[in-house]
Amino acid sequence: MKLSEISDNPGARKKRMRIGRGIGSGKGKTGGRGGKGQTARSGVRIKGFEGGQMPLHRRLPKRGFNNIFRLEFAEINLDRLQDAIDAKTIDAGAVINAESLVAAGVLRRSRDGVRLLGRGELKAKLTIEVHGATKSAIEAVEKAGGSVKILAPKKDEGEAA
């Protein structure tokens, strides 16, 4: 047996069907697309068209608005912080802020700031600087002997006072 003699088992690889190559091919003329018209054409589909019936996006009323001042915080729970400290990803002695969390890979990005949530237990004494925190999170950090400093949201930092 040589490398040049190795081949697939018969029927292991099926030949692809070439469409539009004559009636005798079994997939000629219309090529499996039915008759002529819009549906026979390439990629033509009217989005949301329901055959003349009033489409859903026009049947339902408009609702709400997009607040351009909305702030979106990246959220982190105490148990995630404790896991990162246990794994030595974060130094418990240093100040923990948005930049250090992103640099350590605990958060992917900090968006408009970081908000600390109170799920889980915290054993380490931490100094945390975040843009928002729940009461339970602040209590848990202070109970462990640490402190939480609330910063102004990132969007406000760039504005003139």
Swiss-Prot record:
GO terms for cellular component: cytosolic large ribosomal subunit. It holds the Pfam family Ribosomal_L27A. Residues 1-43 are annotated as: Disordered. GO terms for molecular function: rRNA binding; structural constituent of ribosome. Residues 21-37 have a biased composition (Gly residues). One of its GO terms (biological process) is translation. InterPro entries: Ribosomal_uL15, Ribosomal_uL15/eL18, Ribosomal_uL15/eL18_sf, Ribosomal_uL15_bac-type, Ribosomal_uL15_CS. NCBIfam families: rplO_bact. Binds to the 23S rRNA. Belongs to the universal ribosomal protein uL15 family. HAMAP family: Ribosomal_uL15 (MF_01341). This is Large ribosomal subunit protein uL15. The lineage of its organism: Bacteria, Pseudomonadati, Pseudomonadota, Alphaproteobacteria, Hyphomicrobiales.
